[in-house]
Amino acid sequence: MDAAGGDQLSLAAVRDALVRLEDSVVFALIERARHPRNAPAYAPAATAGEHSLVEFFVREAEALNAKAGHYQKPEDVPFFPQDLPSPLFPTKPSPKVLHPFASLVTVNDAIWKMYFDELLPLFTVDGDDGSYAQTVALDLACLQVLSQRIHIGKYVAEVKFKDAPQEYSRLIKEKDSNSLMDMLTFKAVEEKVKKRVEKKARTFGQNVTLDDNATAGDSECKVDPKVLSKLYDQWVMPLTKDVEVEYLLRRLD
C-alpha cells in the first residue's frame, strides 16, 4: 500500500485500500467457488516430498514472485518465507511510514488454517472435477488477498498510534494487550463493514439475465453473501486487530 503524500501515512489512503480489497476478496471467492472442493489437491503426495499440491504450488509461486520483486512491502507477507530468493530485478523502494520491524509481523499461519479448515467448506460444494492445478491457483489468489487485507492492519495501527500517541504508549509500556484491543475496536464501524461486504457479494455474485422481472435470492448467488459477512466478522477483522496489537506492542522498540 502506498501512502498518500510522500512519507506521510494517510488515513484516507488506508481506508480506500481496505474498501478496494473488499472487492478483491469477494471476486476471489467467487472464482474459487466455480470449482468443487477437490480434496485430492490437499492430500500429501510422496512424489512431492509429502507436500500437498497446494503447498507445493504456493511455495513455487512465492519463490517466483520473490524473484520478480514481490514481498518488498509490509502488507505483502509470504506464507513460506524460509529461503525465499532475492529479487532479480530493481524494485522501487516504498515510503518508510512504518516501524522497521513491521515486515516481521505476520498471522499467515492462522490465515492458512482458517482458509482450509473453516472457510473453504463454507463456500465450495463437496466434489471432485479433476481441475486440481486451477483449483490451487485460485486458492492462492484467495490466500494472497486475505493476507494482504489483514496485514494492512499494520498501517491502521500506525495511523491510530499517531492519532493518540500518549494513550497508546502507556498501554504499550504496560504490555496491556486487552486494553489495546479495546481501543482498536469500533463495533459500529465493524457492523458497517459486514453489511457492505455482504451487499457486495450479493451484487457481484448475481447471475445477470435480460429478464427485467428476474429476482435472485441469496441461494442463487455464486457465493452466499452471508459467508462474506461471517468471514469478516469471525476472521478478517479479528485477525486484523491481532496484527494491530502485535505491531503496537513493538512500536516503541
UniProtKB/Swiss-Prot annotation:
It is found in: Cytoplasm, Cytosol. Signal peptide: none annotated. GO terms for biological process: amino acid biosynthetic process; aromatic amino acid family biosynthetic process; chorismate metabolic process. GO terms for cellular component: cytoplasm; cytosol. Keywords: Amino-acid biosynthesis, Aromatic amino acid biosynthesis, Cytoplasm, Isomerase. Pathway: Metabolic intermediate biosynthesis; prephenate biosynthesis; prephenate from chorismate: step 1/1. Pfam families: CM_2. The keyword DNA-binding does not apply. Residues 2-253 form the Chorismate mutase domain. It catalyses: chorismate = prephenate. PROSITE patterns: CHORISMATE_MUT_3. No allosteric regulation. InterPro entries: Chorismate_II_sf, Chorismate_mutase_AroQ_euk, CM_AroQ_sf_eucaryotic, CM_II_prokaryot. It comes from the Eukaryota. Its main location: cytoplasm. Its EC number is 5.4.99.5. GO terms for molecular function: chorismate mutase activity; protein homodimerization activity. Homodimer. Interacts with Cmu1 of the fungal pathogen Ustilago maydis. This is Chorismate mutase 2, cytosolic. It comes from Zea mays (Maize). The gene is CM2.
